[in-house]
Amino acid sequence: MPKQITEIKDFLVLARRKDAKIVKIKKNSLNVKFKVRCSRYLFTLVVNDKDKAEKLKQSLPPGIQVIELK
């Protein structure tokens, strides 16, 4: 089941969880969506600022698999 997150700090905490498997980054013309797959939920964070999205991408934990879509 999907859940939406509004805070970047909450997303980073979720990405560092032990059951977080993969992060998908989906870019379109208006915003960037970060989707982290955990064992029970798919958490989504929508970022409207491209610079913040790039910083968030660089601050993801190194052990997690990252896939960029479009």
Curated annotation (Swiss-Prot):
Keyword presence, Ribosomal protein: yes
Alphabetical keyword list: Ribonucleoprotein, Ribosomal protein
Cysteine pairs bridged by disulfides in the record: none
Entry GO MF terms: structural constituent of ribosome
One Pfam family per UniProt: Ribosomal_L38e
GO cellular component: cytosolic large ribosomal subunit
Presence of the UniProt keyword Ribosomal protein in the record: yes
PANTHER family linked to this entry: 60S RIBOSOMAL PROTEIN L38, LARGE RIBOSOMAL SUBUNIT PROTEIN EL38
Family: Belongs to the eukaryotic ribosomal protein eL38 family.
UniProt protein name: Large ribosomal subunit protein eL38
Native source species: Ostertagia ostertagi
